[in-house]
Amino acid sequence: MSAFASENLTSALLVVGTAIFAVLVGAKFLGGSGKPRKVLNPTEFQNFVLKEKNEISHNVAIYRFALPRPTDILGLPIGQHISLAATIEGQPKEVVRSYTPISSDNEAGYFDLLVKAYPQGNISKYLTTLKIGDNMKVRGPKGAMVYTPNMCRHIGMIAGGTGITPMLQIIKAIIRNRPRNGGNDTTQVDLIFANVNPEDILLKEELEQLVKEDDGFRVYYVLNNPPEGWTGGVGFVTPDMIKERLPAPAQDIKIMLCGPPPMISAMKKATESLGYTKARPVSKLEDQVFCF
């Protein structure tokens, strides 16, 4: 064999070897199956590092936590949530609270949490003390809701404050899976979103953009303290608002509720008075009125 041929053979083998190595490394990062690796563990807490913090207002922020590898995904079914745990001074045992990420498994390498810090909120206040590079203990997935495309014809949602997070997760999944996007989800969605002041309306720009993009999604805002010229709802969410804005009781509809406990209690009574099936103390997937 000539020196030229030998050199070409060596180069070819080097290229093939490099390609095989790249495939093996890629397979390792993707969990060996060609699919992104899911990192959530439903039985054990894991530490995730705070990567970014974006302050939306004086008491609301989006926390971005890094996953171990840039190709990893959280592995959170649509409609489910995660548990956050922390040891907090003055508390006799570890505090655990549930949150729904506003990101999805379509976004690899991280997950985002939208959190409002309440004066009496243990985990929400703890999050405000975290610095970039600090760890947060996370476990999941958990929850009775697992959304599947076309599980019902029409969904009516009532959200208050940060109760918008599980709703947004489902709304975005539905719109991503529309026929125009290569999917098959034709579910209609109507959302009543209640807040105290205009500045309390979280993720309003994103919601408005989704309304523009999708004619199967509508939002009705309700404010306790509306500004001059406000055209949305005023005060608390009423049975009349529900009757006018959300789907009427039927076998193929679902009402979803998420918000402060007093609001949820009132909405359970309101929906029952309008003929929807009475909400259970602990919701199940098949329930007509589902409380997160």
Swiss-Prot record:
GO cellular component: endoplasmic reticulum; mitochondrial outer membrane
One GO MF term attached to the UniProt entry: NADH dehydrogenase activity
SUPFAM superfamilies, sorted: Ferredoxin reductase-like, C-terminal NADP-linked domain, Riboflavin synthase domain-like
Localization annotation: Mitochondrion outer membrane
Catalytic reaction(s) noted: 2 Fe(III)-[cytochrome b5] + NADH = 2 Fe(II)-[cytochrome b5] + NAD(+) + H(+); 2 Fe(3+)-[Dph3] + NADH = 2 Fe(2+)-[Dph3] + NAD(+) + H(+)
UniProt membrane topology term: Single-pass membrane protein
EC number(s) stated in the UniProt entry for this protein: 1.6.2.2
Needed co-factor(s): FAD
Domain FAD-binding FR-type: 43-148
Pfam families in the record: FAD_binding_6, NAD_binding_1
Pathway: Protein modification; peptidyl-diphthamide biosynthesis
Enzyme class name: oxidoreductase
Keyword Methyltransferase on entry: no
UniProt feature coiled coil, ranges: none
Role of this protein: NADH-dependent reductase for dph3 and cytochrome b5. Required for the first step of diphthamide biosynthesis, a post-translational modification of histidine which occurs in elongation factor 2. Dph1 and dph2 transfer a 3-amino-3-carboxypropyl (ACP) group from S-adenosyl-L-methionine (SAM) to a histidine residue, the reaction is assisted by a reduction system comprising dph3 and a NADH-dependent reductase, predominantly cbr1. By reducing dph3, also involved in the formation of the tRNA wobble base modification mcm5s 2U (5-methoxycarbonylmethyl-2-thiouridine), mediated by the elongator complex.
Complex formation: Monomer. Component of the 2-(3-amino-3-carboxypropyl)histidine synthase complex composed of dph1, dph2, dph3 and a NADH-dependent reductase, predominantly cbr1.
Family affiliation: Belongs to the flavoprotein pyridine nucleotide cytochrome reductase family.
Protein name according to UniProt: NADH-cytochrome b5 reductase 1
Lineage, broadest ranks: Eukaryota, Fungi, Dikarya, Ascomycota, Pezizomycotina
